[in-house]
Each structure stands twice: as C-alpha cells, then as structure tokens.
Amino acid sequence: RQYFIKCEEELHKVAPVRSAALRRELKARITVASYFKPMCAALEAYRAELGKNTFQHHYTTEANMLARIVLGGMTAKQWAQANGITGEPRDHMSTLQLEHLSYLEQSNITLIELGQGYHQRKAELIRLSQRWLARRMEE
C-alpha cells in the first residue's frame, strides 16, 4: 500500500511538469506551422516585385535552407530518413528544434520583405541562428 501511495505522490509531482512540457511542444508546433504560409507569401511577393514567377521549387528551397540550419545540415526529408521517421518531419522534431525553426521562419519573412536575396538571407539567418542558440545555452 505504501508503494502505491509513494507512486501517487510522485505522479502529482511529475504530472504538472510533463503537462507544461507538452503544452510548450504543442505551442511550438502550432507557431512553426503559422509562419510557413506567410513566409511563402512574402517570397512570392518579393519575386513578383522582381518580375519573376514563383514555382514550388522556390518554396522548397527556402524550407530546405531553414531545415539545414536547424537540423545540422540536413533537409527535413534527409533528417527524417536518417532518424527512421515516417510522416511529417515537423511532428517529430523536438520543442527546441521547432522553436528554432519558427524563429528562423519569422526572421526570414522580415529579411524577404526587406528585399534581401537568397544568399544574403542565408548568411544572416545563420548568424541569427547562432545568436539564438547561444542565448538558449545561457538559459
């Protein structure tokens, strides 16, 4: 009986922590999803200003650039294959990876709207990523 009482006490200690972690993970997943469409819209508007059409591979290139920064040089597809993941890779990313990706997507929107080209944005996003990760390490 004491064993079950101790288990119940431990559960009451752990449950709020786990619940908070799950809420943070869900928030990160929703946030990263909410920035993707505006990023694509910003890219399309930027390319239209340049008189260029935007095709599917342009969106893929942007997504792959950000994924490579977050996932250690791999695209989301490569990362999923390397980790034996089926389905949507973002559904299997850690909360930290999702928060990192959403930060970069949000930053990329701003850089696109400022008229920066792909290579300039990529360099700036790598720099911003390093700063973001350094701040996270300090927490």
What do these predicted ranges mean?
Residues R1-E139:
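Positively charged, phosphate-engaging catalytic surfaces used for nucleic-acid and nucleotide handling
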